[in-house]
């Protein structure tokens, strides 16, 4: 079996890093303005230091907050179902037994997502996605069976794509102190002592000397297992994905060496050891991005609005300077006034000598500053509206910003606008984020959830597929419902004139369409077999009633004749 090599890992890290260096400068600029609190790693800043002191106009901060809240609630809401699971055979899904199990499976998947920290991690992801057009999760199953989702810090990870533009390898860099490293990755012998077989000699010495605070640079790489054999999937260590964690550098550490790059030397090249070697059958990371061609997204609201953001910031500073010049201008006057106690405070006495009074000396502004504040404010407001549009805040907050115009027609118009404007972003999120996240949890529930009921025998060998029912997804799929409603209304109106038009109208199809477009829960519409059985029973009952009504007059006449005959006798 092929052994893993640090040299190979380092070669791949340098390859991935060289690709990231193409956009590093852009990310630094985007993070500095869009997410300054997340620029610590990529800009090598000190932890705890305030990083947004250069931001004066917060328009984009508020717009980004609306963007994150809108996508968190509209795409992956914690308060309502945003996905359901079916099979690729839609006819098989219509079976009552299959539909009930698929609903049960969906509930278990949503429960697994809800009991993890996914929704908190998703909020951080949308911040990264809105600023650098890329976000990444790493999934970790804790020893107690719980799922913890890590949102990776922008700039601390590198990505390599496969031939289809999907992330095939991710390489993380992070710093950890000596004590935390030994506690997390250190092993124990059978007698409870320390097993130092996977810890470098330098780190061991630091730990034994009590030098716990020294930061160690660590690399964690995740890629497809080169030793994976698909012909033997049940083998314990034969799993598709490989995780390798190893020490990279020791000494000051990343956060402790301000302005320096991540250390680039292995602690001890002679010690070809890994802190952790781990294989898993599930791809443990997701890289969501706005475009598929490059390893990282290249299109997004912040990069489109960056010029406006900087201009607004500059205008805010210039406006404050202009107002300051009006209130406290630079003054000129006789030199004799320098001896006076000049003050801008109200109700203040400024003593003057007799010569200054006779010469009618006075102070005058050096510059004639008369800024068009009204024009500047209007220009700033126009730019703020453009920033809101680039972050979709004007659509996401339409109802809250227009509380007096919440008519059904306008609400429907907003949904159609969301479909057209947010649609491209949603498609990208589906391919690079929603589907991978949901498929990871689906696989986790299938193999790890003890409360999942066994599927019906009729579903054996069927491939499962996720379907999204979020607010944004409904806005896209339900776009034809207004036209269907108009058609149904037309049929109802025409039926009052000529009821024969109802023969053309398929009510069952209408019910099925609404169930599909609105993603209604399973079981709300009866299966077609039950509907047909009920209609057959109703038709049989109607037929018996009709037969009874037809035979009743003859029976009554016979009874009357018999009664008359008895009376004659």
Question: Model-found features: residue ranges?
Answer:
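C-terminal anchoring/interaction modules
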Residues: 1-22, 26, 34-35, 41, ...
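Extended, charged amphipathic alpha-helical segments
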Residues: 240, 248-412
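Extended, helix-rich architectural segments
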Residues: 1-214, 221
């Amino acid at each position: 079996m092929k052994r893993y090599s640090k040299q190979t890992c380092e070669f791949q890290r340098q390859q991935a890093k060289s690709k990231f260096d193409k956009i590093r400068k852009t990310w630094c600029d985007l993070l500095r303005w869009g997410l300054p609190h997340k620029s610590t790693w990529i800009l090598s800043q000190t932890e705890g230091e305030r990083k947004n002191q250069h931001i004066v106009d917060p328009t984009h901060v508020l717009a980004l907050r609306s963007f994150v809240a809108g996508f968190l609630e509209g795409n992956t809401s914690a308060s309502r179902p945003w996905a359901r699971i079916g099979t690729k055979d839609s006819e098989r899904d219509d079976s009552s037994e299959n539909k009930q199990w698929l609903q049960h499976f969906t509930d278990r998947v949503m429960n697994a997502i809800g009991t993890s920290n996914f929704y908190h991690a998703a909020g951080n992801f949308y911040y990264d996605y809105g600023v650098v057009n890329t976000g990444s999760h790493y999934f970790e199953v804790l020893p107690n069976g719980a799922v913890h989702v890590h949102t990776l810090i922008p700039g601390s990870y590198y990505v390599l794509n496969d031939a289809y533009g999907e992330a095939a390898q991710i390489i993380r860099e992070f710093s950890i102190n000596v004590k935390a490293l030994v506690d997390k990755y250190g092993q124990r012998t059978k007698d409870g002592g320390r097993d130092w077989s996977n810890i470098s000699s330098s780190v061991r010495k630091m730990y034994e000397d009590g030098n716990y605070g020294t930061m160690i640079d660590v690399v964690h790489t995740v890629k497809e297992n080169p030793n994976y054999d698909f012909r033997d999937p049940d083998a314990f260590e034969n799993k598709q994905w490989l995780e390798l964690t190893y020490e990279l550098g020791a000494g000051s550490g990343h956060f402790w060496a301000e302005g320096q790059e991540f250390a680039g030397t292995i602690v001890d090249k002679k010690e070809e050891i890994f802190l952790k070697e781990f294989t898993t059958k599930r791809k443990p990371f997701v890289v969501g991005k706005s475009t598929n061609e490059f390893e990282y997204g290249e299109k997004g609201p912040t990069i489109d609005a960056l010029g406006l953001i900087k201009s607004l910031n500059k205008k805010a500073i210039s406006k404050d300077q202009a107002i300051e010049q009006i209130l406290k201008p630079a003054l000129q006057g006789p030199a004799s006034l320098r001896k006076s106690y000049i003050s801008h405070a109200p109700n203040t006495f400024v003593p003057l000598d007799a010569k200054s009074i006779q010469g009618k000396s006075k102070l005058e502004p050096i510059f004639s500053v008369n800024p068009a504040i009204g024009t500047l404010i209007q220009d700033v407001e126009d730019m703020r509206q453009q920033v809101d549009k680039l972050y979709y805040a004007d659509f996401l907050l339409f109802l809250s910003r227009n509380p007096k115009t919440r008519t059904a027609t306008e609400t429907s118009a907003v949904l159609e606008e969301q479909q057209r404007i947010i649609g491209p972003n949603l498609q990208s999120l589906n391919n690079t984020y929603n589907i991978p996240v949901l498929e990871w949890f689906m696989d986790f529930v299938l193999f790890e959830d003890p409360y999942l009921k066994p599927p019906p025998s009729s579903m054996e060998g069927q491939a499962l597929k996720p379907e999204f029912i979020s607010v944004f997804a409904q806005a896209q799929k339900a776009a034809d419902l207004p036209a269907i409603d108009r058609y149904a209304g037309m049929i109802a109106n025409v039926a009052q004139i000529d009821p024969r038009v109802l023969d053309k109208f398929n009510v069952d199809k209408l019910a099925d369409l609404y169930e599909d477009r609105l993603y209604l829960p399973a079981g709300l519409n009866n299966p077609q077999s039950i509907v047909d059985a009920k209609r057959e029973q109703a038709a049989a009952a109607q037929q018996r009633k009709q037969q009874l009504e037809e035979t009743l007059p003859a029976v009554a006449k016979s009874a009357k004749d018999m009664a008359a005959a008895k009376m004659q006798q």
